Amino acid sequence: MEQVIFASLAASPTSFRKIRMLLDSLKDFGGELFRAPLVVPHPDSLDVTVENARLLKSPDVHMIPFRISSEEMDFPLSVVAIGAAAAEKAVAGKAENLVWLLEDTLVLKSPSAFVLPASTQYAYRPVHHTKIGSLWKDPPDGFWTAIYRHCKVEPDHLFPMDTCVRDNTIRPYFNAGCQATRPQNGLFSRWCELFRSLYRHPDFKPFFANPLYRVFMHQAVLAGVVLSSFSPA
């Protein structure tokens, strides 16, 4: 079993060159993890050209096609949650840790912090900016109240965290493009399942009049699923 498998989503033809840069950075700066496998989930409808396939040709890279409906593709960033679940399924039983990094990531020093300690089930990076995040100093608004209710989040699982740029202290809201989990926990599968249900749910339709709620719905559901799955302790 691998200690770590990395995963990065190829959502469009332009993804391949960026993922190649991520792969090269892992080789150059990955330290003891420089030979860790990389899985690349992609929609099965994506036309993977010979040129793009050649960019990622490596014994350490494995392409993972997955199904996603045209309706789902039309909803912003739904492909992230669905692709993460495909990666998790592909590495189940093959890795102790799955590190999910979107294509805009580069590794500049050993990513050994992604190797989770025995007592840790999930590691994350906070969101960069507050955007639709829930300010810690204020009660949760209607959107986050609905997220917590549908995801069955216990109130004592909430805690304060700063955004990356430290513009606010918010309730837990994780960057969907930089996270690590244990595949056997099925976290990404639950994320995908709940996202597919909730983005269609009438409770959330009114919020989508503001396009930011559409863009970050996948990330809000991720927060709800993580908080319902694990205790901060």
Residue ranges of model-derived segments:
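Residues that flank catalytic or metal-binding motifs in active/ligand-binding sites
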Residues: V80, L101-E103, F174-N175, H218
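Catalytic core and acceptor-binding pocket of nucleotide-sugar-dependent glycosyltransferases
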Residues: E154-A233
